[in-house]
Amino acid sequence: VPLLLLTFLISCKGNSQNKETPNKAYPVSKTDAEWKEILSPLAYDVLRHAATERAFTGPLTYNKKTGVYVCAGCQTPLYESQYKYDSGSGWPSFDRGIEEHLEYDVDYKIGYPRSELKCNTCGGHLGHVFNDGPRNTTGKRHCINSAALAFIPTDEKK
């Protein structure tokens, strides 16, 4: 049994590496040093290294104001507040995004494929999409790191 477990763990580790999309050119491109200069340490880790913030810690998780959620890295509009809902997951959840600004990729980091969401303007990691969202709308749950977003209230939009 220990040998079988070890084999499984090595297999998962092997599957999680080298499966990411090759480097893609995005309209907004910065050096690592430039990203570090403009992003908070947490936003940098999430957007540039696909980290995940701790559940229930993000300032936008329970935001109920009307407005638009933009990429914290490049300010591209990603989500409208009318599609945000409380999934109970501890991260901001939306049943849909602004599709032309989202990129879908496959993430193998935990040993099996998940649908990763990225900003298609800067390539920043946002979170993942799951099929356990509200059945009366899209059935999708865009589970997004609060650190990957900035919020612009309706009265401040240009």
Q: Residue locations for each model-derived region?
A:
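A short Gly-Trp-Pro
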Residues: 26-27, 36-70, 76-158
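C-terminal motif of bacterial Sec signal peptides marking the signal peptidase cleavage site
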Residues: 8-11
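Acidic/polar residues at beta-strand termini and the immediately following turn/coil
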Residues: 15-19, 71, 145
